[in-house]
Amino acid sequence: MPKRKDIQKIMVIGSGPIIIGQAAEFDYAGTQACLALKEEGYKVILVNSNPATIMTDKEIADKVYIEPLTLEFVNRIIRKERPDAILPTLGGQTGLNMAMALSKAGILDDLEIELLGTKLSAIDQAEDRDLFKQLMQELDQPIPESTIVKTVDEAVTFARDIGYPVIVRPAFTLGGTGGGICSSEEELCEITENGLKLSPVTQCLIERSIAGFKEIEYEVMRDSADNALVVCNMENFDPVGIHTGDSIVFAPTQTLSDIENQMLRDASLKIIRALKIEGGCNVQLALDPYSFKYYVIEVNPRVSRSSALASKATGYPIAKLAAKIAVGLTLDEMINPITGTTYAMFEPTLDYVVAKIPRFPFDKFEHGERQLGTQMKATGEVMAIGRNLEESLLKACRSLEIGVCHNEMTSLSNISDEELVTKVIKAQDDRLFYLSEAIRRGYSIEELESLTKIDLFFLDKLLHIVEIEQDLQMHVEHLESLKKAKRYGFSDQKIAEIWQKDESDIRAMRHSHSLYPVYKMVDTCAAEFDAKTPYFYSTYELENESVQSNKESILVLGSGPIRIGQGVEFDYATVHSVKAIQKAGYEAIIMNSNPETVSTDFSVSDKLYFEPLTFEDVMNVIDLEQPKGVIVQFGGQTAINLAQALSEAGVTILGTQVEDLDRAEDRDLFEKALKELGIPQPQGQTATNEEEALEAAKKIGFPVLVRPSYVLGGRAMEIVENKEDLREYIRTAVKASPEHPILVDSYIFGKECEVDAISDGKSVLIPGIMEHIERAGVHSGDSMAVYPPQQLSKQIQETIAEYTKRLAIGLNCIGMMNVQFVIKNDQVYVIEVNPRASRTVPFLSKVPGIPMAQIATKLILGQPLKDLGYEDGLYPQSQLVHIKAPVFSFTKLAQVDSLLGPEMKSTGEVMGSDTSLEKALYKAFEANNSHLSEFGQIVFTIADDSKAEALSLARRFKAIGYQIMATQGTAAYFAEQGLSACLVGKIGDAANDIPTLVRHGHVQAIVNTVGIKRTADKDGQMIRSSAIEQGVPLFTALDTAKAMLTVLESRCFNIEAI
């Protein structure tokens, strides 16, 4: 069927900020979709609130709106642009929910706008738990016994009838938000109450638990002519009961018989046809391990996290083809871009094994609830490809960047058998490592299977890895043992550990016996047809399919899995760097391990190596490709941490040199450089042990800011105000980076701002200064940033620009650099310098319109700044005001304290832009879902050192119609100053303590601060948790509350009696 000619203009709805459950996979899908629609000649209008994405670049769509994804703003854009159709299925749950909201508000009917791809009725049938149940019954597809409830009492009655455990699944939520497995009535009441609040339609499905069944996924596609195919089938290592986003997943399925595969395949195709889905769809099924009995768990009628994984696992571009199907093209008339000869109707075949392992944030949130269930907790994921399961699993383990190079954590060797068995049964994020430890201790795989319900096939593979370890122990420096270990994915580092050698010895031994990896192509057809893709993975076999070209090449290292502190912003910079390399006439090679991102789309670079970002794996690619050099600036700390070892191995690092990277990271060298350049910094010292740290703090004076060097995202950073706290910090946190000393700095409570700069070593371009709304003490990634600065004098801005230029030239910076400043009493101090791309690059690239990563890459490749048409110094400021606001995922992370501090906690960001600060702030708050009513009750519970400042805020809140409530100490202080506040009860005083008031909807906002001593009491954490659980706006920094107040005041009319 030819593409539709009756529509010209299509709006694509993006997925908004990155949160747990909805990450970079939608940037990848949205980018593909917009480009595919443009390729077909349609005019594309994109709306998304996330500036950190490739998708929101001007060239991706004809018009790009970075605006809040709320009905208010999307409606305005629709009325302005008048699109003929909207494509909502590539914007995750956000896109689908927006489509439903537009329909319910009558906007689509009113403006005669069509929804493309999946119809509203299909979205409703798949997402509405009741309609889905009816459809499955009509299709004769088995689903677990279940009921739809709108109250807690209904849930309790049903559970009493069918027995526990039961699963709660709220309707229209993402990543299992609000759901869970309940083993008792108490758990059921708690989870259902929360689930009903989080469901936009106040509806939960309560179903019989089928935990322990195998969890299987089918990624399917269908077009308007009813052609349908399975792109990829996947099997979860973990049985049903753990969210698929938190499970280790293998593709293709590993343990199914042909009969089982055909049965589930037929069911998936039957469902997509019945729903009349046009595009991509994900079907999740549960299979009884002991019979042919199965259940349909759920259907996602859209492109999803699994679609991104399936696309990267097979090379089949699901989102691109889904967009083309949405405008009428059919699978049998579209060419598969991988082979260039077969049609998209041809089902991919894999002759390799793909492993996906989730990346969790518990290295940052040590007190978070780590037990896994039906609510997703991972922030990102890694993928690895191998010729056998062991190889792909071990490559994925070392891609995680959690300090392991194997499926082994050495710290587990000290735990008791009792603790080991508990951790094996109660699945946490690190269960794989406990299982492997149990096998090393001699537990049988049959015992482990009965404890975990993980299939014996997978446990046998873990046993095989342990057997290879034992073989290596018995045959030190034995060539055949080395070959076998390499064939099954062992790293040089692990083999060196077992043989008690250096990693370099293993590398030398391999090379002396010509034992090199070969690179195989991902071609969708198991080599049945010639493929055109430059998409490769390594393995230890004979035939190498990756041929070095005659063109000079540059290798760009990606940033690995998305985690807190290192998000999609770095992928953005990587993709732009590749574009500049190609424009400069070089072959651009990317190496990365993240299946969610645009950088791992094979069409972005000239060659893509889907490999772990370790010294060994990077060197193997360098040995084959012999690039002119390697760029490490755009891959975050992941790539920077490899620079030293690569340089020592004789690799050319392009851009800022390793010794200069060291001068920025090494405290003593940095201090020396600042003195030479005449730039002030907070007084500070380095310390390598407890005595030195205490001595430094005594000399500097408390409070001090302590942190390890060479970390990203404020990892293990803390403000301490006495010796006891400092001793506690040294004992617990120095582990964060044991081979490097810790930094002890004077803590200056002033205004923070940051700058990104681009330098060729002689000239320095500063795209802009970003002023932080929150004062020092809140991590820059968690602060709201304003561009251009609103409260910095011209003189201070000139000083910042001057210091930045001095630093860039003094540190021989070639490419990018990020500098953070604190200002107190008109004195500008440098806090830190990062000689690489930072997380603000996408925001600052979009706002003044400077393609920062591309310019930086051109300078790295040797072009002078002046030849690119840019002047030295600060770039002219934008006429609009732009706000970058953080987005948090606390609702998914039980027991993680939402108190903001020097360690980063946000998972994503949004942007608000307008003609005034107040309007831009309003948009930013709307975009990050901090919607505050115009009046109501606000609770203040304030630390002594900020009560005076909080008083003036409380007075302003009262003036616009808010009723002030406060805890005992705060209320007493307010009363002394002439402001009466309603007293709230102590925690535990059930009638009117804050959690109770919050639960009953009597509180519209909470302002809660703690003193500089950040070990906040339990009561404070309970207050903050109750606000997060009930979705009540919570401010733990007075500056953020002040910003919100500014917005509310600007929207208030003055009402006075005459």
UniProtKB/Swiss-Prot annotation:
ATP-grasp domain sequence ranges: 133-327, 671-861
UniProt key word Cell membrane: no
Q: Where are the transmembrane segments?
A: none
Q: Which GO terms describe its cellular component?
A: cytoplasm
Cofactor binding note from Swiss-Prot or TrEMBL = Binds 4 Mg(2+) or Mn(2+) ions per subunit.
> Where is Mn(2+) 3 annotated to bind?
Q820, E832
Gene Ontology biological-process entries: 'de novo' UMP biosynthetic process; glutamine metabolic process; L-arginine biosynthetic process
Going by the UniProt record, its keywords in alphabetical order are: Amino-acid biosynthesis, Arginine biosynthesis, ATP-binding, Ligase, Magnesium, Manganese, Metal-binding, Nucleotide-binding, Pyrimidine biosynthesis, Repeat
Tell me if Cell membrane is a UniProt keyword of this record: no
The residues listed in the UniProt record as binding ATP 2, with positions renumbered to this chain, are R707, S746, I748, E752, G777, V778, H779, S780, Q820, E832
| Residues that, per the record, bind Mg(2+) 4 | E832, N834
Mind telling me which HAMAP family this protein's record contains?
CPSase_L_chain_A, CPSase_L_chain_B
Outline the subunit composition.
Composed of two chains; the small (or glutamine) chain promotes the hydrolysis of glutamine to ammonia, which is used by the large (or ammonia) chain to synthesize carbamoyl phosphate. Tetramer of heterodimers (alpha,beta)4.
Q: What family does the entry list? A: Belongs to the CarB family.
Q: What is known of its domains?
A: The large subunit is composed of 2 ATP-grasp domains that are involved in binding the 2 ATP molecules needed for carbamoyl phosphate synthesis. The N-terminal ATP-grasp domain (referred to as the carboxyphosphate synthetic component) catalyzes the ATP-dependent phosphorylation of hydrogencarbonate to carboxyphosphate and the subsequent nucleophilic attack by ammonia to form a carbamate intermediate.
Listed name of the protein: Carbamoyl phosphate synthase large chain
Which organism encodes this protein?
Answer: Streptococcus pyogenes serotype M49 (strain NZ131)
The gene from which this protein is expressed is: carB
